[in-house]
């Protein structure tokens, strides 16, 4: 790999500020981005870690009955927490990859990658 700055954002505001840098990339679970970096198919100037931003993790039902899922929520959490309200989404999340991928990969990363063969982009 090559040199880049690593930014560990603690809040959404910090992440947004860091991502305004030229060629900065958001890093969640890294299931797609890390192999892309290793293959030298991307060369961001900075990686902005979204891990640990509490407001980006979790699943809840809003006052108007909508399911809200934070972008940094791992697939395994989506599978567990969405089961009561959206069983099809929970089943989809529970069958992504293997347990290691489900515990590390995130719904936001999957949607941001927008691979047409991936599960979430076709479901949402």
Place the predicted regions along the sequence by residue.
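C-terminal structural segment of proteins
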Residues: 1-124
């Amino acid at each position: 790999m090559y040199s880049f700055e690593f930014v560990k954002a603690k809040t959404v505001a910090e992440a947004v500020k860091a991502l305004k840098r030229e060629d900065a990339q958001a890093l969640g679970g890294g299931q797609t981005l890390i192999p892309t970096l290793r293959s030298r198919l991307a060369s961001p100037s900075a990686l902005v870690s979204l891990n640990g931003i509490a407001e980006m993790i979790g699943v809840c039902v809003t006052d108007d009955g909508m399911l809200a899922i934070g972008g940094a929520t791992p697939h395994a959490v989506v599978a567990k927490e969405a089961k009561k309200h959206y069983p099809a989404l929970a089943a989809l999340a529970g069958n992504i990859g293997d347990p290691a991928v489900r515990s590390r990969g995130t719904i936001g990363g999957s949607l941001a990658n927008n691979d047409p063969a991936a599960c979430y982009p076709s479901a949402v």
